[in-house]
Amino acid sequence: MPSISPFAGKPVDPDRLVNIDALLDAYYTRKPDPAIATQRVAFGTSGHRGSSLTTSFNENHILSISQAIADYRKGAGITGPLFIGIDTHALSRPALKSALEVFAANGVEVRIDAQDGYTPTPVISHAILTYNRDRSSDLADGVVITPSHNPPEDGGYKYNPPHGGPADTDITKVVETAANDYMAKKMEGVKRVSFEDALKAPTTKRHDYITPYVDDLAAVVDMDVIRESGVSIGIDPLGGAAVDYWQPIIDKYGINATIVSKEVDPTFRFMTADWDGQIRMDCSSPYAMARLVGMKDKFDIAFANDTDADRHGIVSGKYGLMNPNHYLAVAIEYLFNNRENWNASAGVGKTVVSSSMIDRVAKEIGRKLVEVPVGFKWFVDGLYNGTLGFGGEESAGASFLRRAGTVWSTDKDGIILGLLAAEITARTKRTPGAAYEDMTRRLGTPYYARIDAPADPEQKAILKNLSPEQIGMTELAGEPILSTLTNAPGNGAAIGGLKVSAKDGWFAARPSGTENVYKIYAESFKSAAHLKAIQTEAQDAISALFAKAAQKNAG
C-alpha cells in the first residue's frame, strides 16, 4: 500500500506552492523535442496532459494539437462551431490563447465564454448536444482545456467530437500523430495569427454558457423538490470551473445552498494536501476534501467538484465523504425507481473495476447491467441513444439521462451528481449515506480496495495483452472461479488487463498508462481478511506470470 504523507489532509506550506511566474514563463520558453518520449503529445481519451516545467505541456504542444484538430475537423466534414472552455489551472488561459490563434488562422468558428470565465467539462458537452439536436449537418464539437483534478502545475487539453463525449482512439490517435509530426517539422504547416487578431476574427464569437445550462437543469434533476424541502446544502467548487455556476443555480432555483468558498487561486493554496502531500483537487479523496468534510454537520448534504466539474464528491452528514462506489449504487437505485419516463429497457452502465454492489442493485431493480472497460468513452453511445439510463466510473465520474429519458450529457457531470444527492435527501428524507447503509443490510457489505504494484514496460505489455488461459487460476481465496475475462462482458471490448470473479469476490488488474505500476482492484462480500487474501493471490498470480515470461525470454 502507498505510504500516507505526514502532510496529507493539512494546509500546504506556502514554500511548497508552485511558482506561477516560472510556470507561465516555461510555457513559452521551453520547446518540446518530439524525439524525447516524455515531451511528445500523448493524446488519450482525457486528452493531452503535462506540465510546462517538465516540457510536456508547452506552447508548441497546444499550437500543434490545435492545428491537428483543425485538420481533423476539415477531413471529417465538421463545419459547425467549436465550443471551447477552460478550467482554473494556471496553464489553461495561455493554452486557450494559443488555441484561439490557430483556430482563427484556420477559419474555425469558435465560441468562447462571454465573460472570459471558466467552463466545466459537462457544460461543453451540453452545449455541443444542444446545438446538434435535430441537425444532421454543420455539427458542432468542442475543446476543454483542463488536466482535471491534477496538481496546479499541470495543464490539459481534450477534444469532444459532435457526440459531445470524450473522443475515442480512432480520433485521438489521428490528432496525436499529426501534432507530433508538426512538432518534428519545427511547426511547419501550423497556421497562426496574433492573439489580438484571433479575438477580432469574425469566426471568434462570445457565447453565454451559463444561462442555457443552468436553465436546463430542471430537465435532469427535480429542482422543485429540492427547493420545497428546504434541505440545507453545502457546496465546495474546490476553486474550479464550477465556481461561476453555483450562484446562478442557487438564484434561479431558490435552493437552500451555501457555497463554502468562491476563492480561485492558481496555486490552490486553500486546498489541503492529498495522500502523497501533493495538491490535487480530487473530490473523492478524504485528504483533499478535508475542508468540506470538516463542515459535514453544518448541512443536511454537501458536495464538491473537481477542477473541471466532471467529478463529484458527496459528504453525507454523519457518514462523511462517501466512497464513490457507494454513491454510484445509491444513485442508480434511486434514479431507476424515480424516473418513470425512462425507457423500461434502459440499462445500468458500469466499468469492470467498479463495485459489484452495482451488479446486485441492477438485479434487484430488474435492469440490464452493461459492464465495459475503464473509460467514460464506453458510455457515450448508450447515453446518447438512451439505451443506458446511467453510466458511472469508480473514480467518481458519472452522468444520467434527462427526466424525459433523453440524453443530457455524454461526458461526466459532477454538477448533476451533486444536485442528485440533494434530490435524494429531499425526496426520501434520508441522505445517500443512510440509503447505502440500508442497502448493505439487504445486499451485503462489500470490502473494496485498489492497490498499485511495480511493473516495468515489458511486464505492463504482458498484462495488457493477456489471454484468459494464461492466468491458470481455478480458485480465488477458497472459492471456485466463475469467470476469467480479458474482454468486457457488456461490449466485448478489451479490458487492457484481466478480471477474475468468484461468488463472493473478484479482482481486476490493469497496467497504469502513466507510471511503471499495475493496478489491482479487488472486492470481497465476505470480510476485510477475505479481501486481503484476494489481493495476495492476485499479486502472486501476476508475479508468476511475469516470472514465466522472463524465463521464456531468457531461454
Curated annotation (Swiss-Prot):
GO terms for molecular function: magnesium ion binding; phosphoglucomutase activity; phosphopentomutase activity. Substrate binds at residues 45, 49, 148-149, 158, 310-311, 393-395. SUPFAM superfamilies: Phosphoglucomutase, C-terminal domain, Phosphoglucomutase, first 3 domains. CDD domains: PGM_like3. Disulfide bonds: none annotated. It catalyses: alpha-D-glucose 1-phosphate = alpha-D-glucose 6-phosphate. This enzyme participates in both the breakdown and synthesis of glucose. This is Phosphoglucomutase. It comes from Komagataeibacter xylinus.
